[in-house]
Amino acid sequence: MGHIVSLLTVVDIPRLHFASPSATVKVKGPTDSPEDSRRESLESFVESRCPSLYGGFKPASWLFNGHLQTAYAVVGDFSKIDKVDYDRTLLRTLDGGTIGLDSTPPTDERTLPDDTPIVVVLHGLTGGSHESYVRAILAPACTPVEQGGLGYRGIVVNFRGCAGVPITSPQLYSAGHTDDIRVAVLHISRRYPKAPLLGIGFSLGANVLTRYLAEEGQQCRLVAGCAVACPWDLVKNAQRLEDDWLHREIYAKAMASNLQKLMGRHAESLAKFPDHPLTKAVPGVMAAKSLTLSKFDNTITCIGGGSSPPFPFPTCWDYYAWASSHEMLAKVRVPFLALNAEDDPIVQVLPVEAGGNPYVAFAVTEKGGHLGWFEAGKSIGDVRRWVSKPVVEWLKAVGEGLAAQDRQIQPTHVVDGFLKEVGRDDIGCKEVEGGGHVIGVEGEGGLLAGL
């Protein structure tokens, strides 16, 4: 009966927002010769290469609103689908912190050409490369072409302390701190200088990606970006989470619980820095019985969510105002696709006009929840993420269709063992021991997935 109802479900056609006129992008011609390239409007580029955005999304009949779609993202069993394994590389940053790069396919599985497009992924709040929403994109993107995939390489940037990455300094991560993705991209571009780098971020990671792209401007090493379920205006969206009883008691507390558990796992590591304000704040947040996201951020993130300056912030609301990405969106200078659902219970304020930025295509579905977009498959009980379709189409379009762009990329050099960008000495990274093989479906037990 449920399958029959699903057949009657109204198709949700995304609303697409472009600046008028949209930017023109340089696309490849019949050959890779620069002489064969031509200019095409971003709107035409998306329309011709991302048909799923125009064909629509049909939500599974039993996941008919944003709360149910979001809940299924958390409690659904995705261990049997989208299996992705990785090789992990650990990077040490100048402040002593550690970030983890998980690369797929593993080197013992197959070898890819050096110019293979690379999908650089930023995960959500307390996620990592194991998250089902990450694997839902990387599985089709990194499956060999002869098996129906794109044949790309995927590299997930796991934030400090997430997905088993150790905490080695009294600094965490946040929605606004971009230096870790900056050095990660620096490392990836140095290792694969011939490969086009395509950025995609989910939720908090989408916010970080948007800010990074905006800050880099014409010097960006990524040739395109995609933001999925980005929280954009952190002040307004956090305020709505606080003001509504249901959102506060379910979503704000669930996210805070994840962060609280994550801090508990690293309390011993942080104890090695007894005089740091972050370490001193940990016992209070660990003892809290009813913690919301804003209370956690007011105690922990506004102190240790990034380097100084601008951290620490007086309150979480000062941090939210600084870290928001909605106003930064106007400064992005690479082709950029944003996808949000109107019924997302966590993200309810969407900057669809993108500050008039002609490089942005902003797609909004009526349904889908937060990192959900589940639709019924061909058989009863088969549920898949619709959002994988337009995202993979976008990755194929920008990875294979764009011609080389004129960008002002700064050269790199190695100073005292750290890879740095010439002219900038405050950030850098180097590989350190650790890492190994990572099985994506195993995940990080004890934390709610999908947030």
Predicted regions mapped to residue ranges:
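Alpha/beta-hydrolase-fold enzymes
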Residues: 3-31, 192-308
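N-terminal cap/lid segment of alpha/beta-hydrolase-fold proteins
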Residues: 62-114
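Short, surface-exposed "cap/lid" segments of acyl-processing enzymes
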Residues: 93, 98, 102-168, 187, ...
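Alpha/beta-hydrolase active-site loop
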Residues: 170-192
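Active-site nucleophile elbow and catalytic-triad environment of alpha/beta-hydrolase enzymes
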Residues: 302, 308-328
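Short beta-strand/loop motif that positions the catalytic acidic residue
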Residues: 332, 338-340, 344
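Catalytic histidine neighborhood in serine/cysteine hydrolases
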Residues: 357-373
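Catalytic active-site module of serine/aspartate enzymes centered on a nucleophile-bearing elbow/loop
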Residues: 368, 372-450
